[in-house]
């Protein structure tokens, strides 16, 4: 039920007692609404019950195990959110002068330095407002670099067939042609195909390491050498950075540019459509093209760098500083954990993944790459379950919901049939992993004896199986558009 359906003329919630906020900030009359918003007329109790019930029907990191592969659904520490909400941060106006924002600017400057140290890249811009926008910025910098050298014939970006879908999207948005590179049977890139396809038209290659197959790319140094010798650059998709924190740096692997997903690796709020942040880090040759603004330190303090400092910049990607509140959360997360803590993040994430993979194979599941060690995530292929029991990976995923577990990523990467991509982040305990194994064992037994239970799942949730095509083609997003 929608809250609008609870509405009845005359009902209202009592005004909340205002918090003590120091100064009283009022909105000038010329900016105030001329008519009241079309809000539902409900009592405070109705509103509280409605949204509390909705929250109890949702899966979340706070309430459920959430092994969504390639998403790193880790716990967001509450203390980090509290620190980012200090009055000095949240009451600062985006147009405040530099001399009125020294604490804020110093924090962002330190965050730039932390990211530089983590990635092994000297240049950092914090402004992109999502991982996808950071990815676009990275490819745009590759294009600007080649154009500045008069190397305009480079119109191709090489992308593995196991890549995230945003990779080809970013390349196309920047005007490049996408050239797909196949994956070899062992899960690594097919080097022979790469050698055939790299050449004078290659602007760069986009890679995730570890890949979306949950495997570390063992020939990365050779790949970097091949692409660089051909005049191209290497782009690092930071989606799986959680697996290598403190162990190896993208810059040391030969990458020239990357973006970071703060909502994955650095525990900022995840999902809900934002706000987000996707900082970019670059090697020395791409520093002139970084998006603005960036924070600079001089003898007189901290300042925003301008177009005069970076005349070849690809420009702005957002108003002001991007989503500063998200950047602050990532900064405090790094500050709380420290260097040793971030190292343990990757160690525990990798340990959890390999332990879970081993335990699931013990109860009958098949690893997509049984001869390879997992990084932070791994893939099960349910081909035999489909053949023997006529149940699909989607059926398994839907049945997991009945057991209070959010489903893993299904049918991605596309090259692995009937796959589940499973990622148990470092914040999950052994007890939680063992409980998940027990559930997976039970579901597999159900598939062999009562497959219809899986085919008709979920049975305990208000929303069953949606018509994805209908939902995408017939949008129903506005209550008043369909009820007036």
Swiss-Prot record:
The UniProt record lists the keyword Oxidoreductase: yes
Pfam families from the UniProt entry: Aminotran_5, GcvP2_C
Gene3D superfamilies reported for this sequence: 6.20.440.10, Aspartate Aminotransferase, domain 1, Type I PLP-dependent aspartate aminotransferase-like (Major domain)
GO cellular component annotations of the record: cytosol; glycine cleavage complex
The EC number(s) this enzyme carries: 1.4.4.2
Catalysed reaction equations from the record: N(6)-[(R)-lipoyl]-L-lysyl-[glycine-cleavage complex H protein] + glycine + H(+) = N(6)-[(R)-S(8)-aminomethyldihydrolipoyl]-L-lysyl-[glycine-cleavage complex H protein] + CO2
A GO molecular-function annotation: glycine dehydrogenase (decarboxylating) activity
GO biological process: glycine decarboxylation via glycine cleavage system
Keyword field contains rRNA processing: no
Enzyme class: oxidoreductase
Residues carrying N6-(pyridoxal phosphate)lysine: 264
Similarity section: Belongs to the GcvP family. C-terminal subunit subfamily.
UniProt subunit comment: The glycine cleavage system is composed of four proteins: P, T, L and H. In this organism, the P 'protein' is a heterodimer of two subunits.
Protein name: Probable glycine dehydrogenase (decarboxylating) subunit 2
Organism encoding this protein: Legionella pneumophila (strain Corby)
